[in-house]
Amino acid sequence: MKSKEVTAVLDQFHFQGQHWHARSVEFSDVTDWHNNLVFEKEIISYRKLGYRGNLLFAFNGEDNCGIFFLKEAPCSSVQLAYQGKDFLTDFGKFTVTGLGITEKDVTPDRWTKTYGCVLGIYGEDELSRLQALRSYQKNIRTYRADRDEMIMMNTWGDRSQDSKVNESFCLKELERAARLGITHFQIDDGWQIGKSPNSAVARGSFKNIWDNKDYWKPDPQKYPRGLHPIVKRGKELGIEIGLWFNPSIQNDFADWQKDAQALISLYREYGIKIFKIDGLTIPSKEAETNLHRLFNKVLEETDEAVIFNLDATASRRGGYHMFNEYGNIFLENRYTDWQNYYPYWTLRNLWMLSKYVPAEKLQIEFLNKWRNTDKYKGEAVSYTHLRA
């Protein structure tokens, strides 16, 4: 006999009345593939139906007062133990579904954290509902201007991968960054001894990183004096230095403590406080838990001085509504080399997301539009004159 599917319930509320309206909001990340990131659906709640998304706004048509549910989870398409829906509506009954765990994730010896659910109330209009949501989001992480505000230059943008980054290159780039008013200079993949699969100079891997205990130390051939000259010159110019980092992915981030110690050591030796976290794949609840442990350990040991730029461009990651307590979101890779950078595309994504995600939580790229103009020849509108 076929067993009946059981809906995993995060939260639910049952209100009186027949005139409930709702809006579900679904998000897409994996922005290397997706360029439409926000999907709204307006409904009149009737008989029991399911909807996808991280947000559900519901309001009573008789008095226009409402509630919202925020599901603190990755985007719907990459959630763990996903049952195809995030919300159920049934007249005045609203249910948040999907715990992000299965029975195999629950053991008697420890607490297993599910996805989160936030309930908020709001008044009579659109502004009220968005203000209620934003009021909560602003309190997830204490905002500090000296830590959280930045205009960042990243070395990956010149498209040479890791083939150019070295002490001389970085010192020259710092001078140019200062002229542009850059506040943070981030050295991407290539500063470290270990080689990633994206290396242009050697065949590398993200697996078994800790087979090389020096993987996350500055490459002595590129940086013979370590990162000290870079950090020193940055301070003189008023520019903070950041680094790229890829946690060791195998076995559900089982080496999270080693990763945490590597980050803490970089903070203590060089004062590095900004790390771009790349290459994540979260295949299980254990992996998600270990990532929380990694981030929490680093913040604890650095008195919350560190901020993580969490890459949302690929794979199964945290999306826009999970891990928000740790920093900001690196939204997308767009390159003139690939003819996929148009300013209005980028600004459109920022505009649509900013309705539901604080804009200051999003890192948005702006490129040198005078590079590769030949690739845009023949388009109906001149690339260099495109506007949002």
Predicted regions: what they are:
Residues 132-176, 180, 184, 188, ...:
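An acidic-aromatic substrate-binding cleft motif
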Residues 81, 125-126, 163-165, 320-321:
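Short conserved micro-motifs at the rims of enzyme active sites and ligand-binding pockets
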Residues 186-375, 380:
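Aromatic- and carboxylate-enriched substrate-binding clefts and catalytic-loop regions
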